[in-house]
Amino acid sequence: MTYKDLRNFIKTLEYQGELKKIDFPVDPNLEITEIAHRTLKSQGPALLFTNPIGHSIPILCNLFGTISRIELGIGIKNILSLRDIGKLLAFLKEPQIPTGFRDFLSKIPNFRQILNMPIKHVSNAVCQENIWNNAQDIDITQMPIMKSWPGDISIAITWGITITQGFTNKRQNLGIYRHQVLSKNKIIIRWLAHRGGALDFQEWYTHSSEKKFPIAIALGADPATLIGAAIPIPNTLSEYAFSGLLRGSKTAVTKCISSNLYVPAYSEIILEGYINRDDIAVEGPFGDHTGYYNSTEKFPVCTITHITHRNNPIYHSTYTGRPPDEPSILGMAMNELFIPIIQKQFPEIIDFYLPPEGCSYRLAIVTIKKQFLGHAKKIIFGVWSCLNQFMYTKFILVCDDDINARDWKDVIWAISTRMDPARDIIIAENTPIDYLDFSSPISGLGSKMGIDATNKWPGETQRTWGKPIQMNNSIQSRINDIWDQLHIPCNEKPFKHKN
């Protein structure tokens, strides 16, 4: 099942016991963050605060706080199904002409899914049931915008989908960026230089003679569009198209009142506005996904000129902090999308994992089917340059395919027994680094480490390599057969050695 809007999804969550309505008065200033954080850590439900102190609009939090709710939101039974969409993205990134009739037939499912990529235009959209366009009526602080952490400089919009379009690019880009609230009609948009919105703005700034860069921000879109906007995909592909792939149907959009941008038609709230060419301000500090307050930095200021919303709108929000948080849960799920794209370039990769403790992308664990001397080092350099977001990955660890990349016990065993620090570590200096990473000596520039934790072949070592201990299969089977008769008090299932 897929959902045309957020409200349908909320009804399903409530029916399945995955959403809790909270009528008790709670303050958007810090209190909701603490409640949502405790709930998320215990894998609890989504939360709908119906009585936020000082506001009449309810707040929805913790929407994608579990893998099961992400699966439900895009209508899949298992998160591994996202690899099928990843395969389609890999196909779109490097399409191949069918080599024959059989090959053509095998590609038909791809072509069918592609039919869901174009947008569907909707007139009289519900997101424009109420329109505020007089300057004196524009007041975004009427929304119950949260202050997440004690050291945050102000309240901030966290789940707004920012829609932009470059000067020459026909596709419209969707991205999730933090919006610091400056006043009733002004916000700061914090986007990193490599993200689609920033690239669109830079292209417009360079080539356009206009003074105002149009912006739209959608709050409370349908789950597929929310997830689609949160995932970094190739810049040539619109997130509207990607959302259609996730949903299995075209994304419904409607034209903005003040510009030619299109917004999700069933959104709860829409903010329309513009960025003046040289209007910038210092953003932050805010608590971030790293678990620290980020440093201050200058970013563009957006002036809001129009607010539209549904009748009785819902404000969708979240907090970011040290994992686990909602972005890290989403990152774990969306990890599956990248695997087919990476495997298309490096078929020898068996698994690719971004642990949530690595703050989304700072540490990657890769397992490979090793085929030649120095193979791990090839993969390390390849991953750093494979996709844009991986240029910020500080640590890449490569293991053999007998290691479970998602089991720290396995990974640490490989590091401890298969790696020599002097021989098997690569240090790359003066490389691009996330400016939020205060551990780097210069903002935006730092070092990276690649670790080869694979078994070493002759030529990579002069010593006889160790042979892993392994029990005979016949003995394992025998003990499995008699295990229950032994009556050993043990919560774990009988351990089975890897073949």
UniProtKB/Swiss-Prot annotation:
The keyword Cytoplasm does not apply. GO terms for cellular component: cytosol; plasma membrane. Binds 1 prenylated FMN per subunit. It comes from the Bacteria. Pfam families: UbiD, UbiD_C, UbiD_N. It is found in: Cell membrane. This is 3-octaprenyl-4-hydroxybenzoate carboxy-lyase. The gene is ubiD.
